[in-house]
């Protein structure tokens, strides 16, 4: 059984670490003590290991009440992709990179915004209950991600892609003012709310 959410961006200094911390925060709100059954990690397709979070990203993370001091960047490896239950990327290009590294992860790999659309559609279409992992119909927290991915995949069949494919990408704010980082973290939270909501009701 696969497990955990892996969030991927380019350098693992801004988008993916901010998303990692926001995802943990939202999971804790939704699941309380059960959030530990859904671990969240991040990595970068071109990351250099051991760097702290970008200063603007660290400041915004701290403003949300989480201490980012322990964070260190780490490069993406195929084994991470093979074992993650759900892989969320900042961009379509990074999604392609992930699948190239680990073809078996194809059906578990989405951009953050893409999975948010699918999670919203799954809730609207009422397909979540069809995807409970426990054969006797009881909710099983350990299998939340399997059920959430299955529900999103079912919803995909009836959902049109965005008119502009780039709308599934999350813009990199590195090199821009902190206002752009604030916008980025708002977009991350907007994408993660339906995602975490789907995970919460799928177990």
List PLM regions with ranges.
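Phosphate-binding/catalytic loops
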Residues: 99-203
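Acidic side chains
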Residues: 67, 85, 168-172
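Conserved active-site segments centered on acidic
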Residues: 1-84, 92-107, 197-203
């Amino acid at each position: 059984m696969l497990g955990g959410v892996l969030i991927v961006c380019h350098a693992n200094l801004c988008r993916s670490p901010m998303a990692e911390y926001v995802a943990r925060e939202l999971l804790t709100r939704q699941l309380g003590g059960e959030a530990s059954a859904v671990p969240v990690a991040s990595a970068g397709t071109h990351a250099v290991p051991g760097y702290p979070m970008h200063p603007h990203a660290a400041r915004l993370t701290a403003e949300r009440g989480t201490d980012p001091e322990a964070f260190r960047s780490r490069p993406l490896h195929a084994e991470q992709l093979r074992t993650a239950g759900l892989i969320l990327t900042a961009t379509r290009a990074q999604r392609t990179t992930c699948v190239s590294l680990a073809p078996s992860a194809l059906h578990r790999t989405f951009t953050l915004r893409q999975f948010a659309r699918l999670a919203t559609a799954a809730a609207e279409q009422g397909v979540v209950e069809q995807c409970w992992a426990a054969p006797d119909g009881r909710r099983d927290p350990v299998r939340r991600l399997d059920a959430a991915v299955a529900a999103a995949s079912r919803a995909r069949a009836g959902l049109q892609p965005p008119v502009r494919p780039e709308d599934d990408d999350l813009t990199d704010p590195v090199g821009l003012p902190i206002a752009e980082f604030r916008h980025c973290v708002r977009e991350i939270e907007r994408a993660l709310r339906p995602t975490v909501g789907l995970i919460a009701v799928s177990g």
